[in-house]
Regions:
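A domain-start/cap signature at the N-terminus of enzymes
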Residues: 16-62, 182-183, 191-194, 242, ...
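Short substrate-entry loop that stabilizes the transition state in hydrolases
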Residues: 57-62, 68-110
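Mobile cap/lid helix-loop segments that gate and shape the active-site cleft of serine hydrolases
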Residues: 77-84, 167-204, 210
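Alpha/beta-hydrolase active-site loop
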Residues: 111-130
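C-terminal catalytic histidine-bearing segment of alpha/beta-hydrolase fold enzymes
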Residues: 112, 222, 226-272
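Primarily recognizes the serine-hydrolase "nucleophile elbow" in alpha/beta-hydrolase
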Residues: 126-130, 134-180
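Short beta-strand/loop motif that positions the catalytic acidic residue
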Residues: 208, 214-216, 220
Length: 272
């Protein structure tokens, strides 16, 4: 009887050890959460994806990489898609043990209007409450790149570094996606000119005192590069760390290599 009891105890102990080992292995992997929250802006249900790095330890401080998707996409773009911009962002986040946050920000045609802006402010506040946040880098592609520049100009105190991949800095004169932008902003440029100017980074180069990296393509007809190239020249007196990756034969996309170079440049600049 005693022998049987001893065997049962040993089996229980072994099973607990195995369970703990599997638990440790699970924690060692990346963890993805689809997070829902009630927006302070209008009480609606909004979402973002949270990707915690392998071996995440909330006792340690972590940098945060916020990725803003392009027009017509949603919060899953930077988490799942094989585009160079998305792969590059995920690789850098994993390499540096960064918390990767990919918000809907009023998908699918956000353009960083008032609602999207308010959601992102709320998300950043929640992250700082939940985690030991070190630096926050805001990155976006296309519409998301435009949004990254807009948000940084509006809330420079919340962003430590910005990466814009094929975006525009001038929504006053940008001619594409007019209907979607008007819906996001609450009117056309003729109806609310001040709102378009307020959300155009080109008019606020002095706000960009943090490291900034932008990619552009000379043959990009979807989001022409001229306004971003102009912004970068205007930003140089205010920021010590400015990187322009301009591809003379490039279109409306950024390779994973260029994406990685841009993010790493900003991370290095933050170490100064």
């Amino acid at each position: 009887m005693q022998s049987l009891l001893l065997k049962i105890i040993l089996v229980f102990i072994c099973s607990c050890e195995v369970s703990q080992q599997f638990s440790h292995l699970a924690q060692a992997k990346e963890t993805t959460r689809d997070v829902a929250f009630e927006a302070n802006y209008d009480g609606s249900n909004q979402k973002y994806i949270e990707l915690l790095p392998a071996g995440f330890d909330n006792k340690q401080r972590h940098d945060v990489l916020i990725t803003l998707h392009g027009h017509g996409s949603d919060r899953w773009q930077f988490i799942k898609q094989p585009r160079g911009e998305c792969v590059g962002a995920r690789q850098v986040a994993a390499r540096h043990k960064m918390i990767l946050i990919s918000p809907d920000y009023r998908a699918k045609t956000s353009w960083m209007g008032p609602a999207a802006e308010a959601d992102l402010v709320q998300i950043i506040g929640a992250l700082k409450t939940q985690y030991r946040v070190n630096k926050i880098i805001l990155l976006g592609g296309s519409m998301g790149a435009t949004g990254a520049l807009t948000f940084t100009a509006l809330h420079a105190n919340l962003i430590d570094g910005v990466v814009a991949l094929n975006g525009t800095a001038d929504l006053v004169n940008y001619q594409n996606f007019r209907a979607a932008i008007a819906a996001s902003f609450g009117g056309t440029p003729a109806e609310i000119p001040d709102e378009y100017k307020r959300r155009s980074a080109i008019y606020f180069p002095h706000k960009f005192t943090m490291p900034i990296a932008c990619t552009t393509g000379a043959k990009d007809s979807v989001v022409p590069p001229q306004s971003v190239l102009k912004l970068l020249n205007q930003v140089r007196p205010f920021s010590k760390h400015v990187l322009s990756i301009h591809r003379p034969t490039g279109g409306h996309s950024t390779t994973s290599a260029d994406t990685i170079q841009a993010i790493e440049f900003v991370l290095k600049g933050l170490q100064d």
